[in-house]
Design a protein with these regions (language model features):
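C-terminal motif of bacterial Sec signal peptides marking the signal peptidase cleavage site
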Residues: 6-9
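Propeptide-to-catalytic entry region of secreted or membrane-anchored zinc metalloproteases
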Residues: 11-130
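Sec-exported extracytoplasmic/periplasmic mature domains
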Residues: 72-81, 182-189, 241, 245
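Active-site-proximal segment of zinc-dependent metalloprotease catalytic domains
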Residues: 115-194
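The catalytic-center signature of Zn2+-dependent metalloproteases
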Residues: 163-235
């Protein structure tokens, strides 16, 4: 079974609608990586407001969200602080989901958009699975806009918390940090590479099999879990720092 951490483009960019008043979606409808510097630096945004939505009883573990916040605090210059709001929704009952259906769900439920000095991030934990899954592939998450990503929590739960699998918290953390890093511009998506480390055979991923941004299969995840949680390697960190990050 191959586990996929995906990158999709679902942008609707309109350069004439850049008013950032907290209710205008346009600045948050760009392609993945377009807001990399906005996340990493405090040149434009001094704060980050994260909205986490989950379906039914599929709430992410509290430790997962704490891990995410710690990860962001270690990499992003946000002197005004990072907040995370968690909200429950009813099942959209549309599984399997296409990326356009995920984007439609976001349009229905997202309440925060960029405003003044605060950048907004949308994270959705969905039931069901992704439409491109097959008998041998399973998608765990996808970044699909500059400030939007989805995690398929049913799939994550099916592959965690057994004696031979990673804990649910660890697997959620891997997926959410991986997708966030695509929005931070890794690799070569908006944070230019300082050294070539692009795995061109697998899209915008890192060639280092020990890096968080490696194109991951089940065996890769298991190997990394056996040796501890995966982290960003030196090349990925250099890219983020060169684009305004810590």
């Amino acid at each position: 079974m191959f586990l996929l951490l995906l990158l999709w483009s679902c942008s609707n960019e309109d350069n004439n609608s850049e008013v950032e008043n907290g209710t205008n979606p346009a600045p948050n409808l760009k392609s993945v990586g377009k807001s990399a510097n906005d996340f990493l630096s405090d040149d434009k945004y001094q704060s980050l407001a994260v909205e986490v939505f989950y379906v039914g009883n599929l709430q992410p573990n509290a430790q997962t969200l704490q891990n995410l916040k710690s990860f962001m605090e270690a990499r992003l210059h946000k002197p005004g602080g990072i907040t995370i709001a968690v909200k429950q929704i009813a099942s959209p009952a549309g599984t399997p989901y296409t990326i356009n259906e995920v984007a439609d769900i976001e349009s229905d439920i997202r309440t925060n958009y960029n405003r003044e000095d605060t950048l907004s991030l949308f994270i959705l934990f969905l039931d069901g699975n992704f439409s491109s899954d097959t008998g041998t592939t399973l998608t765990l998450g996808a970044a699909y806009r500059n400030t939007s990503c989805v995690l398929f929590e049913n799939s994550i739960q099916a592959l965690s918390n057994s004696p031979t699998e990673p804990s649910r918290t660890d697997l959620e953390t891997i997926v959410i940090e991986h997708e966030l890093c695509h929005m931070l511009g890794l690799v070569d998506l908006g944070s230019p590479m300082q050294t070539n480390h692009l795995d061109s055979a697998h899209g915008k991923h890192c060639i280092n099999p020990d890096c968080l941004m490696y194109y991951q299969t089940e065996s890769n995840i298991q190997n990394m879990m056996n040796s501890g949680m995966p982290t960003l390697d030196a090349n990925c960190l250099a890219d983020l720092q060169a684009n305004g990050g810590k």
